[in-house]
């Protein structure tokens, strides 16, 4: 025990476990770090401050510049909604159209009922398909495709009963069971003599196949029963020595 204490003291030394590192004390080190941080913050503020312009003064655009430049800088999605005075097809193409000169209010008569009916008929195919007018303006080719290739109308479902179309029995899997409705239909329709002969022949063939299979199985059992098996498959003999 004394030897272990002496060895530990020799490892630790005279100064103990916590030796002081050489250099400046802690207080001066912290002060120096604070001063460095303050100097860095002042330099960053100076670098971020705006500098006065030294070059030639910037040229401002003259008012005579057309408004197309500002329109081109707009987001492309802004062209989806056309202005109120511009037609939708022109707005979707993006080509400017010269607007008609403003006329006096009394020069053009108000639209009659025939014009209103024509406008409603033009807007009907799109509305019937569930396409809004803005969709027609953005994607007119889809509306044209729908006009060229109309969707087929689904036939109305017939009520269950004699009016229902019965699928042919030959196209069905043989393993699928026959329903009672089909049996009743056959009984009501009646069977021709040729079909009855075919049904009798198929029934006799199936009976003959069944008789042959049972006969072959009985013939196989006889030699198996006559000879004695050396290794029994019974679970009670599994522990016995062979």
From Swiss-Prot:
Biased composition (Basic residues): 157-172
Keywords (A to Z) from UniProt: Cytoplasm, Phosphoprotein
Phosphothreonine PTM positions: 175
Protein origin, superkingdom: Eukaryota
InterPro entries in the cross-refs: DUF4695
UniProt biased composition (Pro residues): 50-64, 97-113
Signals that turn on the gene: Expression in the hippocampus is induced by long-lasting long-term potentiation.
Intracellular or extracellular location(s): Cytoplasm
Compositionally biased residues, Low complexity: 232-242
Region (Disordered): 16-121, 152-178, 215-242
Coiled coil: none
Modification Phosphoserine occurs at: 192, 206, 216, 232, 238
The protein's name in its UniProt record: Uncharacterized protein C11orf96 homolog
UniProt lineage: Eukaryota, Metazoa, Chordata, Craniata, Vertebrata
Gene behind the chain: Ag2
